[in-house]
Regions:
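Conserved, mostly hydrophobic/aromatic
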Residues: 10, 38, 88, 159, ...
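Acidic (Asp/Glu)-rich catalytic clusters
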Residues: 1-2, 27-34, 53-64, 85-93, ...
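Conserved N-terminal beta1-alpha1 strand-loop-helix module at the mouth
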Residues: 1-40
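Conserved beta-strand positions in the central sheet of alpha/beta enzyme cores
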Residues: 8, 39, 97-98, 168, ...
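Active-site-adjacent beta->alpha loops and helix N-cap segments on the catalytic face
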Residues: 18-20, 46-59, 77-83, 102-124, ...
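Active-site beta-loop-alpha junctions enriched in small/polar residues
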Residues: 11-14, 41-45, 70-76, 101-102, ...
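Active-site mouth loops of central-metabolism enzymes
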Residues: 6-22, 67-79, 133-151, 228-242
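Active-site pocket-lining/capping segments in soluble small-molecule metabolic enzymes
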Residues: 18, 112-139, 187-241, 246, ...
């Protein structure tokens, strides 16, 4: 893969054996495009811990693409996290996505020995030194639970200063929000790479639901066009592919250090954009 930019794909661990087999088949297909790594999510409050572990080990050892597990601190003890770090290190995992994590339904505030992502980054560094390349999350349109944008910028700086190597953003559909976020944190002294997270558009109702939950803004012109297509899946996907391709072109032309695709365990929507961009293989 390009030494100047990095490209990666994200999966979520499935609940069924059939779903897992499909995930691995998708990963094998995407592996032929030589991504820099695959990441694998971690359920709210660590609810998919074992499935995340098993998926990551299979991606790393069988699919032969470096795997980066998500690791969150909400609801987990330091002993739990220490055990996971030991397992990942022993398995040859060298990259981790360190997050506070989503709160399980009914949990009003973060619990556990560590409540913030910067605490987790510091803990990983204390326990493992420089073994892991640590990714953290960035929110160009502000974390949905942040009090305001300035507070959110400060929180990001804390994570970076705690020992993060790079960051992956929440997905967005307005390139200007990414460029503004990067400009602001650079002015605050943060120089780590900040890679845009990319969500292909394939289903409007699912996209709207995800976006409401995570605070990603769907611009009015995109929303109105998607609504106008109704149940015309082919038109939605064609329009979505064009919109995301054009945004990625602008991001890369503007200096973004790569792209991180949220696949939702599907290869083709991300690969359609990849091919349009003529990314290296």
């Amino acid at each position: 893969m390009s030494q100047d930019r990095r490209y990666s794909f994200e999966f979520f661990p499935t609940k069924t054996d059939a779903g897992h087999e499909k995930l691995i088949a998708t990963a094998r297909h995407l592996a032929t495009y030589n991504p820099d790594f695959f990441s694998c999510t971690y359920g709210a409050g660590g609810s998919t811990r074992d499935r995340t572990l098993n998926t990551v080990l299979q991606l790393e050892n069988e699919v032969k693409v470096p795997a980066a597990p998500h690791l969150s601190c909400v609801g987990d003890s330091k002993d739990d996290l220490r055990g996971l770090l030991t397992q990942y290190k022993a398995a040859g995992i060298t990259r981790i996505v360190a997050l506070r994590g989503d709160l399980p339904s009914g949990m009003g505030m973060a619990s556990g020995e560590m409540r913030h992502a910067n605490d987790l980054v510091e803990f990983i560094r204390e326990e493992t030194g420089d073994h892991f390349h640590i990714e953290v999350a960035a929110y160009p349109e502000m974390h949905p639970q942040a009090r305001n944008f300035e507070d959110d910028l400060t929180n990001f700086v804390r994570k970076a200063n705690a020992g993060a190597n790079s960051a992956i953003t929440q997905y967005f559909f307005n390139a200007d929000s990414y460029f503004y976020f990067v400009e602001r944190v650079r002015a605050m002294g943060v120089n780590i790479p900040i890679v845009p997270g990319i969500m292909p558009i394939t289903n409007y109702s699912k996209l709207a639901r995800f976006s409401d939950a995570c605070g990603a803004e769907i611009p009015r012109w995109i929303r109105k066009q998607l609504e106008a297509y109704g149940d015309d899946t082919q038109s939605i996907q064609g329009f979505g592919e064009q919109v995301i391709t054009e945004m990625c072109e602008r991001l890369l032309q503007g200096g973004a250090p790569g792209l991180h695709f949220y696949t939702l365990n599907q290869a083709e929507p991300s690969l359609a954009v990849w091919k349009n961009l003529k990314l290296p293989r």
